[in-house]
């Protein structure tokens, strides 16, 4: 199982939001590049990078910064936020992003999403961001009118390589993971799933670990590792030790 440290970029800074609300911002660093290197230095195997400005505007807003982050790391980067056309997807992948997370476009234009998946096999995943099972789009500010159950079969058929599932009500709240919702999602798809929203402590990591055998590829942690309620090196050590036991 992979623990993805999250670096969310807004106005050129590394921030965290609460429940995706644009005005509920905490700035954790004025230097996202340094923060990305920090997590790599602590042992991260992947970086989860989000262009919040892009998510809210629908267009890349931090492209050059993101390219520099990718070039400055030896670990792979997965990126989401504002990827809403084929040209943007191709540009990011050429700039060093290892894989993309697409949400709004995947729901609004499944054919365009399928074309991007076909052009970059294995490198494009779908972001499913939900409140009580109802999916949100455009930076989590609009209701899509659909549920996870509605869209998963089509997205899998379109060629999505993985799913990033965020429980918006728990994002940035450090309130624990919605395990029943995660369990339902894992039962609905054979795609690898990455969970986000609510991871607060090592106990949450321990609670999620058994789901690795059910299709959970990893978890994303943001506020908890920035504020220290989750000790990132300790979480990595726990995962490594459990992997040895299971080998």
Curated annotation (Swiss-Prot):
Catalytic activity entry: 1-(5-phospho-beta-D-ribosyl)-5-[(5-phospho-beta-D-ribosylamino)methylideneamino]imidazole-4-carboxamide = 5-[(5-phospho-1-deoxy-D-ribulos-1-ylimino)methylamino]-1-(5-phospho-beta-D-ribosyl)imidazole-4-carboxamide
Keyword terms, alphabetized: Amino-acid biosynthesis, Cytoplasm, Histidine biosynthesis, Isomerase
Catalytic residue positions: 8 (proton acceptor), 129 (proton donor)
Transmembrane segments: none
Database matches in CDD domains: HisA (cd04732)
GO biological process: L-histidine biosynthetic process; L-tryptophan biosynthetic process
Chief place where the protein resides: cytoplasm
Top enzyme class: isomerase
Coiled coil: none
A molecular-function term among this protein's GO annotations: 1-(5-phosphoribosyl)-5-[(5-phosphoribosylamino)methylideneamino]imidazole-4-carboxamide isomerase activity
Pathway assigned in UniProt: Amino-acid biosynthesis; L-histidine biosynthesis; L-histidine from 5-phospho-alpha-D-ribose 1-diphosphate: step 4/9
UniProt KW Amino-acid biosynthesis keyword: yes
GO CC annotations, alphabetized: cytoplasm
Annotated EC: 5.3.1.16
Subcellular location: Cytoplasm
Gene3D superfamilies the record matches: Aldolase class I (3.20.20.70)
Stored InterPro entries: Aldolase_TIM (IPR013785), His_biosynth (IPR006062), HisA_bact_arch (IPR006063), Isoase_HisA-like (IPR044524), Isoase_HisA-like_bact (IPR023016), RibuloseP-bd_barrel (IPR011060)
PANTHER family: 1-(5-PHOSPHORIBOSYL)-5-[(5-PHOSPHORIBOSYLAMINO)METHYLIDENEAMINO] IMIDAZOLE-4-CARBOXAMIDE ISOMERASE (PTHR43090:SF2)
The family this protein is said to belong to: Belongs to the HisA/HisF family.
Name of the protein in its database record: 1-(5-phosphoribosyl)-5-[(5-phosphoribosylamino)methylideneamino] imidazole-4-carboxamide isomerase
Organism taxonomic ancestry: Bacteria, Pseudomonadati, Thermodesulfobacteriota, Desulfovibrionia, Desulfovibrionales
């Amino acid at each position: 199982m992979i623990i993805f440290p999250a670096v969310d970029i807004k106005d050129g800074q590394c921030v965290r939001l609460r429940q995706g609300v644009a005005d509920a911002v905490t700035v954790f660093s004025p230097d996202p590049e340094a923060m990305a290197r920090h997590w790599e230095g602590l042992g991260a195997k992947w970086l989860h990078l989000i262009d919040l400005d892009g998510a809210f505007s629908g267009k890349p807003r931090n492209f050059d910064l993101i390219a520099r982050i990718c070039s400055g790391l030896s670990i792979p980067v997965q990126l989401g936020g504002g990827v809403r056309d084929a040209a943007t997807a191709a540009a990011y992948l050429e700039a060093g992003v290892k894989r993309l997370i697409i949400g709004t476009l995947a729901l609004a234009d499944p054919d365009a999403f399928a074309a991007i998946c076909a052009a970059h096999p294995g490198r494009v995943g779908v972001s499913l961001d939900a409140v009580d099972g109802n999916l949100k789009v455009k930076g989590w500010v609009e209701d899509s009118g659909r549920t996870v159950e509605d869209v998963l079969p089509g997205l899998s058929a379109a060629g999505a390589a993985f799913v990033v599932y965020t429980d918006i009500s728990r994002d940035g709240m450090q309130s624990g993971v919605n395990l029943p919702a995660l369990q339902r999602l894992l039962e609905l798809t054979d795609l690898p799933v990455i969970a986000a929203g609510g991871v607060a402590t090592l106990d949450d990591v321990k609670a999620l670990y058994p789901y690795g055998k059910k299709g959970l590829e990893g978890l994303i942690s943001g506020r908890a590792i920035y504020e220290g309620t989750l000790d990132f090196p300790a979480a990595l050590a726990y995962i490594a030790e459990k992997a040895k036991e299971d080998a």
